[in-house]
């Protein structure tokens, strides 16, 4: 595992702040529309903001685990850059959804693409580490010198 994982930690911290901000926006929408918890229905504006936050929250554990796995086992810089792009995609998704349901699509597709790529990188990294550690097969060396 990487000795210094400060890039992954910084992206994780930034993403946690984003999740907190989304929750705060739901709280503001509750006040604006006078919707007391545990109610989750109301005007369409509230429901879109609430749903955008809930969807982001549903994907968050997968994002965090895959970010760290890809960073530890594949490449920290690449994973952190993908993490920043994911945060941007979630921002675009949240604000698009808050405005109109149709405007969420671009951000959603981008974030889904990143959530598809991060696990692939994590699996490649873990497989490479496994082969190296337990079978003494060095993928990186084989790629440099195939024969």
Curated annotation (Swiss-Prot):
Molecular functions per Gene Ontology: enzyme activator activity; glutathione binding; glutathione peroxidase activity; glutathione transferase activity; identical protein binding; leukotriene-C4 synthase activity
Cystine pairs: none
EC number(s) given by UniProt: 2.5.1.18, 1.11.1.-, 4.4.1.20
Signal peptide range: none
Reaction(s) catalysed (UniProt annotation): RX + glutathione = an S-substituted glutathione + a halide anion + H(+); 1-chloro-2,4-dinitrobenzene + glutathione = 2,4-dinitrophenyl-S-glutathione + chloride + H(+); leukotriene C4 = leukotriene A4 + glutathione; (5S)-hydroperoxy-(6E,8Z,11Z,14Z)-eicosatetraenoate + 2 glutathione = (5S)-hydroxy-(6E,8Z,11Z,14Z)-eicosatetraenoate + glutathione disulfide + H2O
Membrane topology: Multi-pass membrane protein
Gene3D superfamilies on file: Membrane associated eicosanoid/glutathione metabolism-like domain
GO process annotations (BP): glutathione biosynthetic process; leukotriene biosynthetic process; lipid metabolic process; membrane lipid catabolic process; response to lipopolysaccharide
Free-text activity regulation comment from the record: Each monomer binds on GSH molecule but only one subunit is catalytically active.
Compartments in which it is found: Endoplasmic reticulum membrane; Microsome membrane
Superkingdom of origin organism: Eukaryota
Keyword vocabulary terms for this entry: Endoplasmic reticulum, Leukotriene biosynthesis, Lipid metabolism, Lyase, Membrane, Microsome, Oxidoreductase, Transferase, Transmembrane, Transmembrane helix
Annotated InterPro entries: 5_LipOase_AP, MAPEG, MAPEG-like_dom_sf, Membr-assoc_MAPEG
Gene ablation phenotype (knockout): Deficient mice display resistance to induced ER stress with reduced cell death and mortality.
Transmembrane segments: 6-26, 62-82, 107-127
Gene Ontology cellular-component terms listed: endoplasmic reticulum membrane; intracellular membrane-bounded organelle; plasma membrane
Main location: endoplasmic reticulum
The UniProt record lists the keyword Lyase: yes
Biological role: Catalyzes several different glutathione-dependent reactions. Catalyzes the glutathione-dependent reduction of lipid hydroperoxides, such as 5-HPETE. Has glutathione transferase activity, toward xenobiotic electrophiles, such as 1-chloro-2, 4-dinitrobenzene (CDNB). Also catalyzes the conjugation of leukotriene A4 with reduced glutathione to form leukotriene C4 (LTC4). Involved in oxidative DNA damage induced by ER stress and anticancer agents by activating LTC4 biosynthetic machinery in nonimmune cells.
Quaternary structure, from the entry: Homotrimer.
Name of the protein in question: Microsomal glutathione S-transferase 2
Species this chain originates from: Mus musculus (Mouse)
């Amino acid at each position: 595992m990487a000795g210094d994982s400060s890039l992954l930690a910084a992206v994780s911290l930034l993403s946690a702040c984003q999740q907190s901000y989304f929750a705060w926006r739901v709280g503001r929408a509750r006040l604006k529309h006078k919707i007391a918890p545990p109610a989750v229905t109301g005007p369409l504006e509230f429901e879109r903001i609430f749903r955008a936050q809930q969807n982001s929250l549903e994907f968050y554990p997968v994002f965090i685990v895959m970010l760290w796995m890809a960073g530890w086992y594949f490449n920290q810089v690449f994973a952190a850059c993908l993490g920043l792009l994911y945060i941007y995609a979630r921002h675009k998704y949240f604000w698009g959804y808050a405005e109109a349901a149709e405007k969420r699509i671009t951000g959603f597709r981008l974030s889904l693409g990143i959530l598809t790529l991060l696990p692939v990188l994590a699996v490649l990294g873990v497989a490479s580490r496994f082969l190296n550690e337990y079978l003494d097969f060095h993928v990186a060396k084989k790629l440099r010198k195939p024969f």
